C-alpha cells in the first residue's frame, strides 16, 4: 500500500483529529529532510508528550505521534476508507459478532536503535487488549474496548478474572479473532483506536511500569522510529529501515 510521509492520525474521533492536526495528515511533507526521501521528519509542536504508552493514553497529540510509529490491523486511506495494514484480509460472521483477521507475516518489531526484536503476531493483539482491560493499568481508552468486546466490561470490573473468557484470541500465529458483545458492522473503524494497537507481550512484561516512558521503552513496527525528543522544542523521527512497506 502506498504510504505518504506521515500516516493519517489515529484517534477516538478521527474526523476531529484530522481537522485539528492536518499538518500530520496524508500527503503532508512539511518538515521532512532536505533530500526528500522521507528518511527524517522534524515536528515543531506546542503540546508536550507526557507518555509513549499508547495502551494507556487518550491524548490526541500522543497517539497522533504514536500512530506513525506503530501499525495496527487497518488504516484509513486519504478518502477515509478503511484498508488493510497489518491485517491482509478479514471476515465476519453473518451477524457481525465474530471477526477474523489474517495477520501480515514477516512484520518486525524493532527497538529505537533499529534492532529486530520479534515478529508481529496475532498474540500481540491479545496481549495489548489484556493490558488495556486490566483496570490496574488505568488505560484511558479501556471503556472503548470494554464496551464492544465480549466480556470486556466484566473482566475490567473484576466480575470475571479469566482473560480466556474475553472475546479475543490468537487462533494461530497469524490468525486473530474478536468476538463482540453485539453486532457491530462498524467494528473495522474501531480498530484504528489505540486500545486495539498491538504490543509485544514479552517486551511489555520486561519493561513493566517503564513501558512507554521514553523512546527506548517502546517497540516500533511502523514507518518511523522516535529518534530524538527535545521537550517544548521539536521531535525527530527517522525512517524505520525494517519497515514492511518501506519501498512504498
Locations of the language-model features?
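N-terminal lobe/hinge region of extracytoplasmic solute-binding protein
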Residues: 44-94, 219
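Sec-exported extracytoplasmic/periplasmic mature domains
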Residues: 74, 78, 105-108, 130-138, ...
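Gly/Pro-rich hinge or "lid" segments in bacterial periplasmic/extracellular proteins
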Residues: 161-165, 171-174, 179-248
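Short, low-complexity disordered leader/linker segments with a strong preference
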Residues: 1-41, 51-54, 81
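Extracytoplasmic/secreted proteins, especially bacterial periplasmic and envelope-associated proteins
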Residues: 47, 64-68, 81, 85, ...
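Aromatic- and charge-enriched surface segment that lines or borders ligand/interaction sites
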Residues: 88-144
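Short, solvent-exposed loop/turn elements at domain surfaces
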Residues: 35-37, 49-56, 80-83, 109-110, ...
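Short, well-ordered beta-strand elements
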Residues: 37-47, 98-102, 125-128, 176-177, ...
Amino acid at each position: 500500500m502506498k504510504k505518504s510521509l506521515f500516516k493519517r492520525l489515529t484517534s477516538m474521533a478521527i474526523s476531529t483529529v484530522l481537522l485539528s492536526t492536518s499538518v500530520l495528515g496524508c500527503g503532508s511533507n512539511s518538515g521532512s529532510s532536505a533530500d526528500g526521501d522521507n528518511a527524517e521528519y522534524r515536528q515543531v509542536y506546542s503540546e508536550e508528550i507526557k507518555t509513549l504508552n499508547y495502551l494507556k493514553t487518550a491524548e490526541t497529540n500522543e497517539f497522533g505521534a504514536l500512530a506513525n510509529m506503530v501499525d495496527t490491523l487497518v488504516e484509513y486511506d486519504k478518502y477515509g476508507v478503511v484498508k488493510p495494514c497489518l491485517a491482509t484480509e478479514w471476515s465476519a460472521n453473518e451477524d457481525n459478532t465474530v471477526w477474523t483477521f489474517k495477520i501480515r507475516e514477516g512484520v518486525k518489531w524493532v527497538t529505537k536503535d533499529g534492532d529486530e526484536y520479534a515478529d508481529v503476531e496475532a498474540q500481540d493483539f491479545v496481549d495489548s487488549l489484556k493490558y488495556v482491560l486490566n483496570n490496574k493499568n488505568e488505560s484511558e481508552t479501556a471503556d472503548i474496548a470494554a464496551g464492544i468486546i465480549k466480556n470486556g466490561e466484566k473482566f475490567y470490573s473484576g466480575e470475571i478474572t479469566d482473560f480466556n473468557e474475553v472475546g479475543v484470541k490468537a487462533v494461530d500465529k497469524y490468525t486473530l479473532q474478536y468476538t463482540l458483545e453485539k453486532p457491530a458492522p462498524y467494528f473495522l473503524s474501531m480498530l484504528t483506536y489505540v486500545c486495539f494497537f498491538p504490543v509485544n507481550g514479552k517486551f511489555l512484561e520486561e519493561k513493566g511500569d517503564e513501558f512507554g516512558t521514553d523512546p527506548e521503552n517502546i517497540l516500533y513496527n511502523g514507518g518511523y522510529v522516535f529518534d530524538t525528543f527535545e521537550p517544548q522544542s521539536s521531535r525527530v523521527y527517522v525512517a524505520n529501515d525494517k519497515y514492511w512497506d518501506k519501498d512504498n
